[in-house]
Amino acid sequence: MSNVVVCALYKFVSLPHFESLREPLLSMMEQAEIKGTLLLASEGINGTVAGNQAAIDALLIWLNQQNGLENITYKLSFDDEMPFYRTKVKLKKEIVTMGVEGIDPLKVVGTYVKPKDWNALISDPEVVLVDTRNDYEVQIGTFKNAINPVTETFREFPEYVKQNLDPAKHKKVAMFCTGGIRCEKSTAYLKEQGFEEVYHLEGGILKYLEEVNKAESLWEGECFVFDNRVAVDHDLKKGQYDQCNACRMPITEAEKLTPDYVQGVSCPHCIDKISEEQRKRFVERERQVNLAKSRNEAHIGSDVNHVIEARRQKKEALRKQSAEKNKAKQANA
């Protein structure tokens, strides 16, 4: 039996004084030796943490005692090793960042579909099935016949909808994500845009894998998760993928054998995207990691989100440039 319990949780709820929750929540997690990150915002709480069973039970009890955080949505999985290095509670503007003002899942949201009913819904030929996750997540697994919007961040999803979905044409839209939280916002957004029949998988992919028999499953591949496991299989056990420590993309054993892969420095996905300055920094970080290992010490490593953010900014700049060119063409027409 795996002795590390991984708990993914979220709840959309009005928390006008969410800042005051940070210190007591962080203190509780540290005392219970829980690692991972929880996000707090005026719209609720979201995150994934891990610890022993008693610690996770204590956290859920603590949250249930806080005003507004009763009956929080959570999913448990298990691992042999702690998948997180740090304990964090962050204050945010949104608990899942879409970047669109006024989207409130507490006011309007799509129709929840339980895992046992999901296969029937997505087998309907009139249903447009959309994976709301990022492209690197979709690449290693998704539902049969699902559309991949090819987004790098959730911020790009509204633009995908504007360019590709039409409420007059697409009468039934079903969406899914890892644990359900992104679909809370994506379905709320579609409802705001005039789509009438909008559905989403209750509990997300993780709940589906937990409850639906593999023989009946329409899931193909593995499910990306945002911790050191990288991905889980249909049994919610650690999958076959590793992760590039430079760009955080999931990588296969075959990709690790290519010349582009250098442990902790680059992989085929990011070899052409990292700067020389970044490469040098990653080389030094890897040297420090190996030095710590030789001393039998823990090394947390540095934050590599700047690589992902740089990629997002570059794509956004290209999108704006394209939009400006289209405006110029229309003006000259």
Curated annotation (Swiss-Prot):
PROSITE patterns, per the entry: RHODANESE_3
Domain spans labelled Rhodanese: 123-217
Enzyme class: oxidoreductase
Keyword vocabulary terms for this entry: Oxidoreductase, tRNA processing
InterPro entries the record matches: Rhodanese-like_dom, Rhodanese-like_dom_sf, TrhO, TRHO_N
Region (Disordered): 313-333
Catalytic activity: uridine(34) in tRNA + AH2 + O2 = 5-hydroxyuridine(34) in tRNA + A + H2O
Residues annotated as the enzyme's active site: C177
UniProt entry tagged with the keyword Oxidoreductase: yes
Its job: Catalyzes oxygen-dependent 5-hydroxyuridine (ho5U) modification at position 34 in tRNAs.
NCBIfam families noted in UniProt: PRK00142.1-4 (NF001136)
Descriptive protein name: tRNA uridine(34) hydroxylase
Species in which this protein is naturally found: Shewanella oneidensis (strain ATCC 700550 / JCM 31522 / CIP 106686 / LMG 19005 / NCIMB 14063 / MR-1)
